[in-house]
UniProtKB/Swiss-Prot annotation:
It catalyses: urea + 2 H2O + H(+) = hydrogencarbonate + 2 NH4(+). The gene is JBURE-II. Its EC number is 3.5.1.5. Pfam families: Amidohydro_1, Urease_alpha, Urease_beta, Urease_gamma, Urease_linker. The modification N6-carboxylysine is found at K490. This is Urease 2. It comes from Canavalia ensiformis (Jack bean). Pathway: Nitrogen metabolism; urea degradation; CO(2) and NH(3) from urea (urease route): step 1/1.
Length: 840
């Protein structure tokens, strides 16, 4: 066929579109991805017919689907579709704005070329149901004053040129086009008093009166036409006016120009204020505004905003971050940021704030106000945007710390793509590939295997940690795997999780300051849960899948969540309890643990692990902070790409069931949001001794960041930043004239190629391995760091998830009682972050 790469990409788009047509033909309302695929692929088909113009194709795209043919969230998720098609006169971009604009679509046209039957409109429900708007911004009432407390002046301006002139908000007004005539002396040190990034356009012959305000910061003028270069003072003003006259720039004195100071008083003529909704549309929500997270019922309210209204650093044509304006001149690379993320909403366990994020040398250098200190107030000293600074526009977007999955079976390397594309940037676990041992346990047993796993993942843009096998009652072998690079040890019943093995493993871990992860004895062979707790002997331990469906003492392993020395986590297939949770688990367990349905004892072993009552209790324990971490158990009773989505599904279910979580009121869910994000960011970092490097959006940590559209939050990120560089991102047609035409896929970027993956990431090992020089011995390019400060941890050290409830479990009914109250939680039939977003 001699196909080009772009043709192969369009075939995948066609396949998705045809799948959507089949679903539409049988009366299924389409989700976001299906709607995009159907409309884009139909445009390509009509283009191939060769009879339609670009304008006609745009029109067709607006009439294929209506609100009744798509899920209720889709009209809010889908506001534009772009695709590049080969027409008889070459490749052209077709853009469809607001493609879901009518009550019903033209279904015959939507199924054109498919030869599928056209369904009756009666098959599609009326679209009158109440529904949430995914990612909606809920603005507080009122207006925001721009540039308060500044000297201001109104000046008359005339365009004597024969072409239009457009002037941006932060352009030094004295420096503008010579064909604009006005009092340039009074404009010295001034700029337009308009919203940052806006502009004023002067058509030929236009007469306009403009409101100017003084520049801020150090008041140093750079750039423009080099009329007034230097600090704002009387001597430089006089020199600038001499240049104005000599170079014949338009100048006319306006002696009676109105001058004053901007205030917060709406009646002050110099005051510029804009409605909060308009502000949010330009720069994202500010303090007091709220965001819905994805299609959940979780509402985040902005607690703090570092922006100075009117001085936001905005990138784009005619915007703020340009030479001498928002971008400084004269600050070399050492003094300026490598990258700035502008005006992002940060959701972290530390708070929900609006700020610029500065990145330098792969680290989070600063969080606050970025820009040009020569003309802007409040720019942080280490947040200078210079000539050597790259920009990622964060307006209207959410930034979180890269997720940490601390229960990973390294069964296949392809799972790592699923991890990073979902927002996971650090993985901890064990395995050697698709061996039976690795399918069941997170252990990398042999020193040679530890070396190989560190080497084989060296170029992958993720932070890695590998755990050795801890199931041994003699210390020597454990010391050897730790020296080979194990950053932790794993006790697992499939290898033996006896009191003797537990005691020995913890004793060795104490010597090396590494964590011990445990999957306890489901069948109670050596004792009950109380005997295992006794073997802990007060020592710190991380209990995997602490509810028990993933493994552990039946039926009451969940009682470990009462213990101060136990750091409990969950795996995501039980997060949260749904009407299908119990039914799917039995076969998972049979496969993972080499069990045989024909052996009654094997069947009983698996069945004993799956208890709806304890899974229901697990939901509530997460909500009260009794379980501290959510992880995956990747490909071994867990899904590596769904750690984040399952966390937010659990939070949403608990809000619906239990109402606001103290200290939240009825207006926001900030405390619950911070509690739940801690479960896959800071808490797994603390437990594994790596929190000084990763786990939160805090200064000094690795710039592992995830950028989300609010409407897709928790389901599909836009950009994953690894060590300060973009590793994965939503990207459209690689042959496209712009980066947004379909098919838009989550794709690896330059941060994954060549030596970048190792340069941007860390391999975590034991201090013993670091001291032995495994980086050089193994030829690793990754930065290698030792884990630390884990052996003294208690649950009280974990963030926002450190409650110590008293838990009992009835051995007959499996009813879980917490602090004297029996727990119950409904098995739900629907969850957010599911069918609105995913084709399969």
């Amino acid at each position: 066929m001699k196909l080009s790469p772009r043709e192969v990409e369009k075939i995948s788009l066609h396949n998705a579109g045809f799948l959507a047509q089949k679903r539409l033909a049988r009366g299924v309302r389409l989700n976001y991805s299906e709607s995009v695929a159907l409309i884009a692929s139909q445009i390509l088909e009509h283009a191939r017919d060769g009879e339609k113009t670009v304008a006609q194709l745009m029109s067709i795209g607006k009439h294929l689907l209506g609100r009744r043919q798509v899920l209720p969230a889709v009209p809010h998720l889908l506001n534009i579709i772009q695709v590049e098609a080969t027409l008889p006169n070459g490749t052209k971009l077709v853009t469809v704005h607001d493609p879901i604009a009518n009550e019903n679509g033209d279904l015959e046209e939507a199924l054109y070329g498919s030869f599928l039957p056209v369904p009756s409109l009666d098959k599609f429900a009326e679209s009158k149901e109440e529904h949430k708007i995914p990612g909606e911004i809920i603005c507080a009432d009122g207006r925001l004053t721009l540039n308060p407390g500044r000297k201001a002046v109104f000046l008359k301006v005339v365009n004597h040129g024969d072409r239009p002139i457009q002037v941006g908000s932060h352009y030094h007004f004295i420096e503008v086009n010579p064909y604009l005539t006005f009092d340039r002396r009074k404009a010295y040190g001034m700029r337009l008093n308009i919203a940052a990034g806006d502009s004023v356009r002067f058509e030929p012959g236009d007469h306009k009166t403009v409101n100017l305000v003084s520049i801020g910061g150090n008041k140093i003028i750079r750039g423009g036409n080099a009329i007034a270069d230097g600090p704002v003072n009387e001597a430089n003003c006089k020199a600038a006016m001499e240049i104005v006259c000599r170079r014949e720039f338009g100048h006319k004195e306006e002696e009676d120009a109105s001058e004053g100071v901007t205030t917060g008083d709406p009646d002050c003529p110099f005051t510029k204020a804009i409605p909060r909704e308009e502000y949010a549309n330009k720069y994202g929500p500010t303090i007091g505004d709220k965001i819905r997270l994805g299609d959940t019922d979780l509402i985040a309210e902005i607690e703090k905003d570092f922006a100075l209204y009117g001085d936001e650093s905005v990138f784009g044509g005619g915007k703020v971050i340009r030479d001498g304006m928002g971008q400084s001149s004269g600050h070399p690379p050492a003094m300026s940021l490598d990258t700035v993320i502008t005006s992002a909403v940060i959701i972290d366990y530390t708070g929900i704030i609006k700020a610029d994020i500065g990145i330098k040398d792969g680290l989070i250098a600063s969080i606050g106000k970025a820009g040009n200190p020569d003309i802007m107030n409040g720019v942080f000293p280490n947040m200078i945007i210079g000539v050597n600074t790259e920009v990622i526009c964060g307006e209207g977007l959410i930034v979180t710390a890269g997720g940490i999955d601390c229960h990973v079976h390294y069964i296949c390397p392809q799972s790592l793509d699923e991890a990073i594309s979902s927002g996971i940037t650090t993985v901890v676990g064990g395995g050697t590939g698709p061996t039976d041992g690795s399918r069941a346990t997170t252990c990398t047993p042999a020193p040679t295997q530890m070396k190989l796993m560190l080497q084989s993942t060296d170029d992958i843009p993720l932070n890695f940690g590998f755990t050795g096998k801890g199931s041994g009652s003699h210390p020597d072998e454990l010391h050897e795997i730790i020296k080979a690079g194990a950053m932790g040890l794993k006790l697992h019943e499939d290898w033996g999780c006896t009191p003797a093995a537990i005691d020995n493993c913890l004793a060795v871990a104490e010597q090396h300051d590494i964590q011990v992860n445990i999957h306890t004895d489901t069948v109670n062979e050596s004792g009950f849960v109380e005997h295992t707790i006794a073997a802990f002997n007060g020592r710190t331990i991380h209990t995997y899948h602490s509810e028990g469906a993933g493994g552990g003492h039946a039926p009451d392993i969940i009682k470990v969540c009462s213990m101060k020395n136990v750091l409990p986590s969950s795996t995501n297939t039980t997060r949260p309890l749904t009407s299908n949770t119990v039914d799917e688990h039995l076969d998972m367990l049979m496969v993972c643990h080499k069990l045989n349905r024909e052996i009654p004892e094997d069947l009983a072993f698996a069945s004993s692990r799956v208890r709806e009552q304890t899974i229901a209790a697990e939901d509530i324990l997460h909500d009260i902070g009794g379980i501290s971490i959510i992880s995956s158990d990747a490909q071994a009773v867990g899904r590596i790409g769904e750690v984040i989505s399952c966390t937010w599904q659990t939070a949403d279910k608990m809000k619906a069931e239990r109402g606001p979580l103290q200290p939240d009121g009825s207006d926001n869910d900030n405390f619950r949001i911070k509690r739940y994000i801690a479960k896959y960011t800071i808490n797994p970092a603390i437990v594994n001794g790596i929190s000084q490097y990763v786990g939160s959006v805090e200064v000094g940590k690795l710039a592992d960041l995830v950028i989300w559209k609010p409407s897709f939050f928790g389901a599909k990120p836009d950009i994953v930043i690894k060590g300060g560089s973009i590793a994965w991102a939503d990207m459209g047609d690689p042959n496209g004239s712009i980066p947004t035409p379909e098919p838009v896929l989550m794709r690896p970027m330059y941060g994954t190629l060549g030596k970048a993956g190792s340069a941007l990431s860390i391999a975590f090992v034991s201090k013993a391995a670091l001291d032995l020089g495994v980086k050089v011995l193994y030829g690793l390019n990754k930065r290698v760091e030792a884990v630390s400060n884990v052996r003294k941890l208690t649950k009280l050290d974990l963030k926002l998830n450190n409650s110590l409830p008293e838990i009992t479990v009835c051995p007959e009914t499996f009813t879980v009682t917490v602090d004297g109250q029996a727990l119950s939680s409904e098995a739900v039939t629907t969850l957010p972050l599911s069918q609105n977003y995913f084709i399969f």
